[in-house]
């Protein structure tokens, strides 16, 4: 993984052309926590942190994120972005988007509580995961209802999505995710998974390396992590006033 040549300042990010944001890279956690000092030393600019509970049977140490950890990220000059995922395909707790409107209400309430407890500002978005390759029928019949439940608690403008290029596009088209302050961008975090090499042009983040059984992702001090390219000056980071 290329090492970045230093951290962008908030002032530079806020005033930069969106193209310049491509020099920033974040990580998100797939195995276990990496210390803020290690993240910074590896040349990354921040992390996506989980404002969700640990699902039964999982042993991750990064859910939910703690105030101590986010304070340490910020003390090291690193950006923080909130995301949410509880269930997962193949687990007793299925994908969150299958929980319908009422499930969306409950998940947003949990996310909001944990985001606040970790020090997250009231203006920052939270990205909610659709962690599988769904089709349009599943989006319309299930995921869309869940997102509307999320919206009822958070408001559209604080709701974001993680998923394939198509999932991100559907969420934007149906008006259930908010807008970055960078013109032309939405709260969409696209993963390369299930995207077939296609890109969603409104996405503020692109998950370019994903830890799987066949792909180790990036290594920081022996820990495998996912890697995310920043595509817009406002990518949902806590430290940007909105």
Task: Enumerate the language-model features and the residues they cover.
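N-terminal export signals
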Residues: 1-18
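Post-signal peptide N-terminal regions of Sec-secreted extracellular proteins
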Residues: 20-23, 41, 71, 75, ...
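Functionally critical loop-and-helix segments that line ligand-binding/catalytic clefts
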Residues: 22-32, 36-37, 168, 173-242
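Substrate-binding cleft of extracellular glycoside hydrolase catalytic domains
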Residues: 23-34, 42, 49-138, 144
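Acidic, His- and aromatic-enriched active-site or binding-groove loops in soluble protein domains
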Residues: 103, 107, 144-160, 176-200
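A short secondary-structure junction signal
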Residues: 138-142, 171-174
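Aromatic-lined carbohydrate-recognition surfaces of secreted/lumenal glycan-active proteins
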Residues: 155-171
């Amino acid at each position: 993984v290329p090492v970045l040549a230093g951290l962008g300042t908030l002032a530079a990010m806020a005033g930069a052309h969106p193209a310049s944001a491509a020099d920033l890279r974040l990580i998100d956690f797939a195995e276990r926590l990496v210390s803020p000092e290690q993240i910074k030393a590896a040349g990354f600019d921040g992390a996506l942190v989980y404002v969700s509970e640990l699902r039964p049977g999982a042993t991750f140490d990064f859910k939910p994120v703690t105030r101590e950890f986010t304070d340490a990220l910020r003390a090291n000059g690193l950006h923080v972005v909130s995301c949410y995922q509880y269930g997962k395909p193949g687990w007793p707790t299925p994908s969150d988007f299958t929980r319908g409107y009422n499930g969306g209400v409950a998940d947003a309430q949990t996310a909001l509580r944990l985001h606040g407890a970790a020090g997250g500002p009231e203006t920052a978005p939270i990205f909610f995961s659709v962690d599988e390759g769904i089709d349009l029928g599943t989006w319309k019949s299930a995921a869309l209802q869940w997102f509307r439940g999320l919206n009822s608690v958070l408001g559209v403008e604080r709701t974001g999505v993680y998923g394939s290029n198509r999932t991100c596009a559907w969420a934007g088209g149906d008006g259930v995710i908010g807008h970055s302050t960078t013109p032309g961008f939405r709260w969409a975090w696209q993963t390369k998974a299930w995207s077939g090499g296609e890109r969603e042009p409104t996405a503020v983040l692109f998950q370019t390396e994903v830890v799987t059984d066949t792909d180790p992702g990036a290594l920081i001090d022996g820990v495998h992590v996912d890697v995310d390219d920043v595509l817009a000056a406002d990518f949902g980071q806590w430290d940007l006033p909105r």
